[in-house]
């Protein structure tokens, strides 16, 4: 499971700066959930092939009232959700009473914590270590978040306590280890899902019908193999079979009785949701058709898109809507979900089972699209046809040239295109290529990523050397030029 690391500390010690440094300010996957987690930000980060989730919290000063007390409460909740805590202190300001209070709380919770002395760019790191040693959390790790100093050592220490089972491997967004032979048919890249079947995460806002859908999918007509508790918090991994196909449901809403079709008010956990997305092969995103698309839905869909997971969208509670309401919702979906237009959309009633069975076909197609690989000849042929129909634009009087393409990875498919001036390819042309590959390869339910690589200039940095013929020509020209200059001088005399 993907580790979760919380950044805590009093206000203005550099938590947000460190958060942006770790997540590389990837705004598309950083979400603020109004009302639910108004003072926590969640972001995905990667370091040396390892993926982890970072929580940025509000500051704790110890004398909070009103909304500040809510901020402190959110920070303490983040500590409970996290697997490890990075406790930031300000080296310039020195140790404060608030620092001592936070350290005491961490010791009581027996939470794996790392003391991080920030802003050491103008202070001796040894002095910072000595200053904060009374906190009783071990030696402080000195960093300067604003300049990136000490970050690698800090991550080495913090991530070193976790097993390396979340390092990205083949079939999980990394390049495939072997090329598809020319003329070979497209094949699936085997992944961890072969044993437990396709891993499906059912996610969505609270009270959209996730629990009802889980119970419907695990109904009595299905063969449930066994129930196995997840390794992190309350997520439950439930392997089951349907039509002799294996699946594993990742249920973030906790254990519930089979056959109890009731959607209680859930306690929404962002961490469990993000971890389920990371661990899944396919995400079924559930929305309430009566409420339409809200901002929170877009935030979660953005995270799914950034992680590259295959996606199926389910509009629940469709059965009780009037025709005019349905038309309006469909119009809104077309307008607001353009960025995930590759995903199948199903209109279902989890309570009555209407349309639920059709989800499995989309899950299968999405997974197959995400893990299929194609030979270089096939991808290059599609590229050549696309360029012939619509050529890349001119840059500085020269046409961008795209020469060949090959598969760089799967889940999601990564297509690497080689050519000249590729750094100038417009985003609109990249979208055109994505749609072309999606149409020709008949890809459904998975994002596509295109990466460009330019050819190296073999003469870059080298001085041109003239041939013997060019040297003789240069001599003749220089001789002719000198004679002409001499004649001009003679005439002036």
Curated annotation (Swiss-Prot):
Region feature Disordered, mapped onto this chain: 167-195, 454-493
Biased composition (Acidic residues): 167-184
A GO molecular function held by the record: ribosome binding
PANTHER family per the UniProt record, alphabetical: GTPASE DER
Family: Belongs to the TRAFAC class TrmE-Era-EngA-EngB-Septin-like GTPase superfamily. EngA (Der) GTPase family.
Family matches, as NCBIfam families: GTPase_EngA, small_GTP
Protein name stated in the entry: GTPase Der
Provenance organism: Pseudomonas aeruginosa (strain LESB58)
Gene: der
């Amino acid at each position: 499971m993907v580790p979760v690391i919380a950044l805590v500390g009093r206000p203005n010690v550099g938590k947000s700066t460190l958060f942006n440094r770790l997540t590389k300010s990837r705004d598309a996957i950083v979400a603020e959930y109004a009302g639910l987690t108004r003072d926590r930000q969640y972001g995905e980060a990667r370091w040396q092939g390892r993926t982890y989730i970072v929580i940025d919290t509000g500051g704790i000063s110890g004398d909070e009232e009103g909304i500040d007390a809510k901020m402190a409460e959110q920070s303490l909740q983040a500590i409970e959700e996290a697997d490890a805590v990075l406790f930031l202190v300000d080296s310039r300001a020195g140790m404060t009473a608030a620092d001592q209070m936070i350290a005491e709380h961490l010791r009581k919770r027996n939470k794996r914590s790392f003391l991080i002395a920030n802003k050491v760019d103008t202070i001796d790191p040894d002095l910072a270590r000595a200053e904060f040693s009374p906190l009783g959390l071990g030696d402080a790790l000195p960093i300067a978040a604003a300049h990136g100093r000490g970050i690698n050592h800090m991550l080495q220490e913090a991530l070193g306590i976790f097993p390396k089972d979340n390092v990205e491997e083949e079939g999980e967004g990394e390049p495939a280890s072997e090329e598809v032979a020319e003329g070979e048919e497209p094949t699936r890249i085997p992944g961890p899902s072969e044993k437990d079947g396709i891993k499906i995460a059912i996610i969505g806002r609270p009270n959209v019908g996730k629990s009802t859908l889980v119970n419907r999918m695990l109904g009595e007509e299905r063969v449930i193999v066994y129930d196995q508790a997840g390794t992190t918090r309350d997520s439950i991994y439930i392997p089951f079979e349907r039509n002799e196909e294996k699946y594993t449901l990742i249920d973030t809403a906790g254990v519930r009785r089979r056959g109890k079709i009731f959607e209680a008010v859930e306690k929404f956990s962002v961490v469990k949701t993000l971890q389920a997305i990371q661990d899944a092969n396919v995400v079924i995103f559930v929305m309430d058709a009566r409420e339409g698309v809200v901002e929170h839905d877009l935030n979660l869909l953005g995270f799914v898109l950034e992680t590259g997971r295959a996606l199926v969208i389910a509009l629940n509670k469709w059965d009780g809507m009037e025709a005019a309401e349905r038309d309006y919702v469909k119009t809104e979906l077309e307008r607001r979900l353009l960025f995930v237009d590759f995903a199948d959309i199903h209109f279902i009633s989890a309570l009555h089972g209407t349309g639920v069975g059709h989800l499995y076909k989309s899950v299968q197609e999405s997974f197959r699209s995400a893990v299929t690989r194609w030979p270089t000849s096939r991808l290059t042929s599609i590229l050549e046809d696309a360029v012939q129909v619509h050529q890349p634009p001119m840059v500085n009087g020269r046409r961008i040239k795209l020469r060949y393409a090959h598969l760089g990875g799967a889940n999601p498919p990564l297509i690497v295109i080689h050519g000249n001036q590729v750094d100038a390819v417009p985003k609109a042309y990249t979208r055109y290529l994505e749609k072309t590959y999606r149409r020709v390869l008949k890809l459904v339910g998975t994002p596509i990523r295109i990466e460009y690589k330019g050819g190296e200039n073999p003469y870059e940095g080298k001085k041109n050397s003239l041939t013997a013929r060019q040297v003789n020509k240069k001599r003749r020209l220089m001789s002719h030029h000198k004679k002409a200059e001499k004649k001009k001088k003679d005439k002036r005399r």
